[in-house]
Amino acid sequence: MKTRWLAIVGRKGGSGKTALALGLAAHYARAGSRVLLVDLDPQGSGTLALGADAGGEALAALLAGTGETVPYVTISEAPPVALVPGGPALEAVTAPRPLRDVLGGVPADVVLVDCPPGHADLDRLALQAADVVLAACEAHRLGIAGAARVLDETKGLRPRPRCALVLSRVDDRRGLDRAAPDLLAGAFALPVLTIHQDAALALALNAGGLPPASGRAAADLEAVAAWIDRTEGKGTP
């Protein structure tokens, strides 16, 4: 089975990208896939959310060519998810080695890369490795503008990864949130997927664990995974 590489990007802090990455990791692991979650963010948000040490030194050394062993740890046994911790040491990485070269030897069915919001070299690294790019943002102007810049960068990649915009923390009581998916689908000519606001998801992340298997957000994450499955082998125009 070919390994799927998914890049979860968000150019603005608070975009919901880390919750999306952790949620998809939990979904695929519960479905029986071997999951490798790569925290490429110097902030180490995903690493901290899972209760691991957010230094990032080992991953930074691997990307720089001075490390040899992939520094992954199993952060959950049920379902099992392997994590490559991120952290501040990644901030100094320049001219990094390709992700598929340094991580390709890890046995995984799905590799999820939680990208940094403001590090061009690391962001580009993830985009170049990805089969799928999910640009996370909230339904407001600044967040959407950041996601648009990321999606625009994928146009120069060959082959171009499959791309979708993922609106996070959607609240159907807000008129803008209800209207945004249709408006943005027309503007971007790309699929627009949604993750609804869900207290259970926020509580799980604050408690230092994987997102729950039930709830509104869990159903939305399942729909995102279904889109990824459905579009396998299809490109982005």
Predicted regions and their residues:
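P-loop/Walker-type NTP enzyme "switch/lid" segment
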Residues: 30, 34-109, 204-207
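Inter-motif core of Ras-like GTPase G domains
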Residues: 122-141
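C-terminal boundary of histidine-terminating zinc-finger modules
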Residues: 203-225
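Beta-strand-loop-alpha "switch" segments that mediate conformational coupling across diverse proteins
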Residues: 169-174, 181-210
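Hydrophobic residues in beta-strands of the RecA-like P-loop NTPase core, especially within AAA+ ATPase
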Residues: 37-40, 112-115, 167
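Anionic-ligand binding region
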Residues: 132-135, 144-163
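Conserved ATPase-coupling elements of RecA-like P-loop NTPase cores
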Residues: 93-94, 117-126, 144
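Walker A/P-loop phosphate-binding motif and the immediately C-terminal alpha-helix
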Residues: 2-42
